[in-house]
Amino acid sequence: MSSVQQQPPPPRRVTNVGSLLLTPQENESLFTFLGKKCVTMSSAVVQLYAADRNCMWSKKCSGVACLVKDNPQRSYFLRIFDIKDGKLLWEQELYNNFVYNSPRGYFHTFAGDTCQVALNFANEEEAKKFRKAVTDLLGRRQRKSEKRRDPPNGPNLPMATVDIKNPEITTNRFYGPQVNNISHTKEKKKGKAKKKRLTKADIGTPSNFQHIGHVGWDPNTGFDLNNLDPELKNLFDMCGISEAQLKDRETSKVIYDFIEKTGGVEAVKNELRRQAPPPPPPSRGGPPPPPPPPHNSGPPPPPARGRGAPPPPPSRAPTAAPPPPPPSRPSVAVPPPPPNRMYPPPPPALPSSAPSGPPPPPPSVLGVGPVAPPPPPPPPPPPGPPPPPGLPSDGDHQVPTTAGNKAALLDQIREGAQLKKVEQNSRPVSCSGRDALLDQIRQGIQLKSVADGQESTPPTPAPTSGIVGALMEVMQKRSKAIHSSDEDEDEDDEEDFEDDDEWED
């Protein structure tokens, strides 16, 4: 008997049915227009009419009407194709409670989505077969829906209501005297004897049981997007799950099963809260970010350091606080040299901004500007590198010509490799936050080097870890299973589709 029961599925497989008025080649072309996993259960040459507001029939198009079983959408459609151009002209889904009328043998009507629709058949034999295919399908769907609504155990039985009272909790049982305990236990036994014991006969059978969880998932319609929990929606967005997947019956069931296996909605939400990343730190460096803006807001050259305009620093040169603008202080021998020794690498930048008589000192100032605000401890530059010491000390008196300045600047640039040998320990300790920040910027060697691999690694573990990664893996397996199906699996899907026709409520 078991082998006999397993044989019914093969007859359920639907094959394409062509039109009697078309040639075999035209029918084959029609079948290719249906699409993947789509089968026409009946085909006929028709004219499509629609009723306008004046209740008059107006012709819309003509072509081949097909009763299409669309497996991907798990639904049935009436579609009209143009076999010459190979395109779809019109379609109407067979919705719930669809009514198909035939006032004439060749003229069939039904209610469309927007208006009353009619099919005018070119051949009455085709019209008869087409009507039979549609009515048989509607009858089968109606029987299945009624079968699902009726409970398997016959009529509904009223549920017996039983009042179960919780036993009273008294402290005498533990702390009272023995006499009270004995009397209390006797009264308790009498009370128990009076109560009627609950039996299976007193419990009614469940009826119209439907599992509607607070997840917002329904076996037939998928997830309810309007009432979906915000935290679950955030999880689905993180996993890249679309609304169409949440509404799909099979895909939504996979997601729902995953949530149940994980421990339910509350467990998933707790896991999400636990895995939520902490707020990012305000900044990576030690010095606060505010100091840089005021420093940059001052005059363009760093020497100003935001304390005042460029002109005042020259007058304050003897204080050694802002020695940067040495152009005005070339006569003073001590302040200019320290700037030269401190950081001459950036000289090329400032000479362009200060093309006055002594361009060499400004470049050196650019490098030292904020670094040497305290006293300039370093002694005058050694005579080793001729360009640097000569330029600041004798720049105003001995190098009036621009050609000499340019040559000195080039010499200083060439000797830049020697100037980089200044040890970091010899620099004065800066006391202000701004100076410390500038020190850190100039001392690029101390900055932590970040490898290229580290940049790409942080983002990867986050999305693929925990509950998010597990759900993404489930969805990837689901996607692979859908895209890797072959023709044999398609036929199995059709059988399941017939057995599991669940697109209606």
From Swiss-Prot:
InterPro entries: CRIB_dom, CRIB_dom_sf, PH-like_dom_sf, WAS_C, WASPfam_EVH1, WH1/EVH1_dom, WH2_dom
Omega-N-methylarginine carried by residues: 307
One Gene Ontology CC term in the entry: actin cytoskeleton
Keyword Metal-binding belongs to the record: no
GO annotation terms (biological process): actin cytoskeleton organization; actin filament polymerization; actin polymerization or depolymerization; cell division; dendritic spine morphogenesis; negative regulation of lymphocyte migration; negative regulation of membrane tubulation; positive regulation of clathrin-dependent endocytosis
SMART domains found in the cross-reference section: PBD (SM00285), WH1 (SM00461), WH2 (SM00246)
Subcellular location: Cytoplasm, Cytoskeleton; Nucleus; Cytoplasm
Domain CRIB: start-end pairs: 203-216
Feature: compositional bias, Acidic residues: 486-505
Domain (WH1) ranges: 34-141
Region ranges (Disordered): 138-163, 184-205, 266-406, 476-505
PTM-bearing positions, type N-acetylserine: 2
Residue ranges of the TM segments: none
This protein's record includes keyword Phosphoprotein: yes
Keywords: Acetylation, Actin-binding, Cell cycle, Cell division, Cytoplasm, Cytoskeleton, Methylation, Mitosis, Nucleus, Phosphoprotein, Repeat, Transcription, Transcription regulation
Assembly and oligomerization: Binds actin and the Arp2/3 complex. Interacts with CDC42. Interacts with FCHSD1. Interacts with FCHSD2. Binds to SH3 domains of GRB2. Interacts with the C-terminal SH3 domain of DNMBP. Interacts with SNX9. Interacts with the WW domains of PRPF40A/FBP11. Interacts with PTK2/FAK1. Interacts with PACSIN1, PACSIN2 and PACSIN3. Interacts with NOSTRIN. Binds to TNK2. Interacts with SNX33. Interacts with NONO (via second RRM domain); the interaction is direct. Component of a multiprotein complex with NONO and SFPQ; associates with the complex via direct interaction with NONO.
Function in brief: Regulates actin polymerization by stimulating the actin-nucleating activity of the Arp2/3 complex. Involved in various processes, such as mitosis and cytokinesis, via its role in the regulation of actin polymerization. Together with CDC42, involved in the extension and maintenance of the formation of thin, actin-rich surface projections called filopodia. In addition to its role in the cytoplasm, also plays a role in the nucleus by regulating gene transcription, probably by promoting nuclear actin polymerization.
Name used for this protein in its record: Actin nucleation-promoting factor WASL
Native source organism of the sequence: Homo sapiens (Human)
Lineage: Eukaryota, Metazoa, Chordata, Craniata, Vertebrata
Gene: WASL
